[in-house]
């Protein structure tokens, strides 16, 4: 009701994968489309929002990262570069001399806030943390709904106390990055348990996210008290997503997923590949901070891909990826709705 959408189905915002076309298709079908803008510059974020608004008159959400910025630990970085050096050398390359912070945080960049205030999408969501009070106040005054991901009750209560409108309950099954605020503490709660926990202790609407691929699963989450569901992995295969051919192929052929922090510096669930089998070992050095580690992973993947080795890609996927179906976004939304009604 707050979002004025027909169906309680959200497209998960996926940085690097979501496109204005995909967002618009979901919104035009009565769901809530989304743009994952955490990896964008303010200028490109603005362009994506305007393009989406040209493709749909319906509501959609935009998403940004609220990670705590940290200085690069030079010693950690050196050890990590040395550890990955053999993988670069295998392709006749050398790792870079230094690592860069490739993703600025919304917390440090009011240019992102100004883009949102200027373009006025219906809703804005945040991952890894909560925006500053002045940012929340500005969004509220502009009439823009705010949403933040929570992976545990402590985060959910902090979100509610901050004056945010909606809580996204991200379970351990979810593909991509854990929205966890403090990486040293992860209760690894599954989506269904998390939804019930937050519904019991908080008054805000809760959106269930993580491992949802079918209308039956969506219906189950709504039955537990969720106001809506958010799906990401199910939509990555759509033609209008920005996923590579290799990523799409992996979604349909490799149903094993694993959580690792070695790709980006933060824990994220993806399809099992070299990062999990060759890089992650009990004796490996501790990776540098997010997003410095991601800078290196992207460079290694680019080099390996030129040699037709796609095992270093960030093929994010949820734990139920085996249930993925080849459907275009409008058809997938319709199918989910039919399944939700059929299961009544």
Question: What role is predicted for each listed range?
Answer:
Residues 177-207, 212-344:
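Conserved active-site-proximal phosphate/metal-binding subdomains
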